[in-house]
Amino acid sequence: MTPRRHGELVVTGVVGRDVDMAAAREAAGLAADNAVTALVEAVGLAGIDRVVKMTVFIAAVEGFTAHSAVADGASAVLRERLGARGAVARSAVGVRTLPSGAPVEVELVAAVTQPS
């Protein structure tokens, strides 16, 4: 998921050039919130057993090294929305570009119980 509200990216660009750290962390949080919302829509909140892994992709300038600090914004949202079920193994990966010029993208792998 990317940092969108009502289908529109709220920020675009490259972290360290167009997007500062505060905006990047906020964008990561919004992307994580969107990912959790998609899970809830699919299986309901009670259907989420736990998030197994989160990967945060960050479009950043060459030489950028604060990937984990950006990903902290996403981790905070998982803890806020899911509590202990959101305590997760995490990777933060720097990339050259992301879809539609997004500065971050969050991918979740979750263990779920299908609704009956």
Mark where each language-model region is.
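Short, polar/acidic, helix-capping and beta-turn segments at strand->helix junctions
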Residues: 1-116
